Regions:
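Dynamic "connector" segments at or just before major functional cores
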Residues: 1-190, 194-216, 222-234, 259, ...
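An anionic, glycine-rich sequence signature occurring as long contiguous blocks
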Residues: 3-22, 262-371, 472-483
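Short amphipathic alpha-helical "interface-anchor" segments enriched in bulky aromatics
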Residues: 39, 86, 349-395, 402, ...
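Short, glycine/acidic-rich hinge or "gate" loops at secondary-structure transitions
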Residues: 87-88, 102-105, 239, 421-431
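Structural preference for beta-strand elements that scaffold enzyme active sites
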Residues: 163-167, 238-242, 262-264
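Acidic, metal-coordinating catalytic cores used for nucleic-acid/nucleotide bond scission
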Residues: 241-249, 269-271
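Short, surface-exposed basic-aromatic patches at helix termini and helix-loop junctions that form
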Residues: 253-262
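Basic, amphipathic alpha-helical segments enriched in Lys/Arg and hydrophobic/aromatic residues
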Residues: 380-455, 463
Length: 483
């Protein structure tokens, strides 16, 4: 068959025998969405979507709410961050199969009626869904769904543990245009939102809450924590919280003590803290100045005492930490910081508390993944399907919080799948690498009379076989739990 120039997309100059054209058969770059949908089924995402309030006239609904939620979550998980991407991917066979609530080959068939979905929902439809989910009731249910499904995964993977640790932190979420809640943050020096986020020591995202950009780090942290506590206690008998110095105020620490949480927080350096540790510090530095450690490694030393700030109602256990930074040309450099905890010594020595706190960096890495790899777009105005500005209505804070909550569901899908892969391969893997190696798989979609075959490339076939086996085993475990 002869070539037609109008079909040619690209012909490289380095090899004119190569010709690139658009596939006329059903080809997808997102076969991994089918794996994610399987994980979503096991975690009960369909049940969560069914619990959300849908105020549309159901006899006129073309795309069920469950399909709309799955569309947005799976697109985010696959790396499609803009709602507009749904229009470009409307006919992608793997995505149509993954988001549909219909079985068999029905998701790929032509619409039988005007109300039968044919392809993915359009950008305007997804935008209206997000507005519908922005009601206070739906946001509460979404937030509860994020937490409940994260805890369910942890229980399924680890059982009820003796103890768990979770981190609370905030981050700057850059925003542009006229949006409710966007404000200048002096610490981050940018116009942004200032959300709170909580992560478990297993890497699961527990909660996220949108806040105005100009609020203090600790603003409403008690209101953020309170709904989580009953659920977290189903996961572990003892719950530890790690927080940074921005949260270390007397009222919050007293409340954490009252609610039965073990906390470890960093304290801002101040003269009073330093004075208490002066003798220990001087003695330690005298010893260190005798010469570097025999193995050449930086040394550290801890010292603990009881301390109460003038603004606090009770004393806390403080651990002063001295860390050697460098030793060159006879000059010793060091760094000093302070931790506070309500844990008794029988629950952890100074070194134990320090080691536990240092894992906080892992939570910060998870935030980086959430922001950089999920990165939901927070639109400033409502747009038409063609992308032109329809009108200048600012998007409400509720709608932007929905964006973060849906991104949290997408993150936890990816993390649940990552945990399966890591357990099998015995090595850590980032979300970006997970997409590259597994999810962003090119495949040929072959439709038969009663079934659909997805043919992935040979380079990914072995890993797909492994993950398929793991998901089948996980599905059996879920069935046994529900039996």
């Amino acid at each position: 068959m002869g070539e037609r120039d109008e079909d040619t997309l690209f012909r490289p100059g380095f090899n004119r025998a190569v010709r690139v054209e658009a596939a006329r058969s059903a080809v997808t770059d997102d076969a991994g969405a089918l794996l994610l949908r399987e994980v979503a089924e096991q975690l009960g995402y369909d049940e969560l979507a069914a619990s959300l309030l849908d105020h549309r006239a159901q006899h006129l609904v073309k795309h069920p709410l469950t399909e709309l939620v799955l569309t947005r979550v799976l697109l985010l998980a696959q790396g499609w961050r803009d709602q507009d991407d749904a229009d470009a991917l409307r006919d992608d066979a793997a995505l149509r199969l993954a988001v549909s609530t219909r079985r068999g080959t029905a998701p790929l068939e032509a619409a039988a009626t005007a109300l039968t979905p044919e392809g993915l929902a359009s950008q305007p439809t997804l935008s209206r869904m997000q507005g519908m989910l922005a009601s206070e009731l739906n946001r509460r249910r979404l937030a509860a769904g994020v937490l409940e499904r994260a805890c369910a995964r942890m229980l399924r993977a680890h059982g009820r543990r003796d103890e768990m640790t979770f981190d609370v932190d905030s981050f700057a979420y850059d925003a542009h245009g006229k949006q409710e809640g966007v404000a200048y943050n002096g610490h981050y020096r940018t116009e942004c939102f200032h959300p709170l986020v909580a992560y478990s020591d297993t890497g699961d995202l527990l909660a996220v809450r949108l806040r105005p950009g100009n609020v203090h780090t600790a603003h409403d942290v008690r209101g953020f924590l309170e709904p989580m506590l009953p659920q977290l206690r189903t996961v572990a008998k003892k719950v530890w919280l790690r927080i940074d110095s921005g949260y270390a105020n007397g009222q919050l620490l007293a409340w954490l003590q009252h609610r039965g949480l073990k906390f470890i927080t960093r304290l801002r350096n101040n003269p009073a803290l330093s004075k208490e540790a002066k003798t220990w510090r001087e003695r330690t530095l005298v010893e260190w100045k005798k010469g570097p450690a025999d193995d050449g490694r930086p040394r550290q030393s801890t010292f603990e005492y009881w301390y109460r700030s003038k603004r606090w109602t009770r004393v806390v256990r403080v651990i002063a930490v001295l860390v050697e930074r460098d030793y060159a040309h006879g000059e010793l450099l060091h760094h000093e910081f302070f931790l506070a905890t309500n844990a008794a010594r029988r629950e952890g020595t100074s070194d134990d508390i320090l080691a536990r706190y240092r894992h906080r960096g892992e939570g910060e890495q998870r935030i980086g993944e959430f922001v950089n790899d999920l990165a939901p777009t927070l639109s400033s105005v409502t747009r038409s399907r063609e992308g032109s500005v329809a009108h200048k209505r600012p998007v409400g804070a509720g709608e932007n919080e929905v964006s973060l909550l849906l991104a949290a569901l997408a993150y936890n899908l990816l993390h649940a799948l990552r945990c399966l892969v890591e357990g099998e391969l015995g090595l850590g893997i980032s979300i970006r690498r997970l997409r590259e190696r597994l999810l962003k798989a090119g495949a040929l979609v072959v439709r038969h009379a009663r079934q659909v075959t997805i043919r992935v490339g040979a380079a990914r076939a072995e890993l797909w076989a492994v993950v398929g086996r793991l998901l089948r085993t996980a599905a059996v475990a879920v069935t046994e739990v529900h039996a």
